[in-house]
Structure formats: structure tokens, C-alpha cells
Amino acid sequence: MAKKTVKVTQVKSSSGRLKAHRACISGLGLRRIGHTVEVEDTPSVRGMINKVYYMVQVEGE
């Protein structure tokens, strides 16, 4: 069975944000505005997405 994934796109800058939020952005593999990555849909990834919801856009929920 294939693992479920979600596409995450960074839509706002991480500069000037909390250190923990910048860590979540890099933990998701995002590097710049407009960058899209496909990550496995796990509880830890969902937690990172929820923490930085205002900086990212999620597809495939």
C-alpha cells in the first residue's frame, strides 16, 4: 500500500519569524517562497504544518 503524502508550498517568508517556526519550515524541507515539497502525511508532519499554517499552503488533504 502506498504511503499517503501531502504537497506543502511556502507562500510567506520565514525571515523575522520565531526560531521554532523557522525550524518547522526547514524541517518540512522548504527553502524559499513558492517552493513545493511532497512529504509523507504523518502526525509529526501535520504538527509542523499546523504550527506554521500562516506561511504554507497544503494540497492533498
UniProtKB/Swiss-Prot annotation:
Keyword ATP-binding: no
Pfam assignment, any one: Ribosomal_L30
GO molecular function: structural constituent of ribosome
BP term (GO), one: translation
Superkingdom to which the source organism belongs: Bacteria
SUPFAM superfamilies: Ribosomal protein L30p/L7e
Keyword list, A-Z: Ribonucleoprotein, Ribosomal protein
One Gene Ontology cellular component: cytosolic large ribosomal subunit
The UniProt record lists the keyword Ribonucleoprotein: yes
InterPro entries, A to Z: Ribo_uL30_ferredoxin-like_sf, Ribosomal_uL30_bac-type, Ribosomal_uL30_ferredoxin-like
NCBIfam families xref list: rpmD_bact
Sequence similarity: Belongs to the universal ribosomal protein uL30 family.
Summary of subunit composition and partner proteins: Part of the 50S ribosomal subunit.
Official protein name in the record: Large ribosomal subunit protein uL30
Organism whose genome encodes this protein: Saccharophagus degradans (strain 2-40 / ATCC 43961 / DSM 17024)
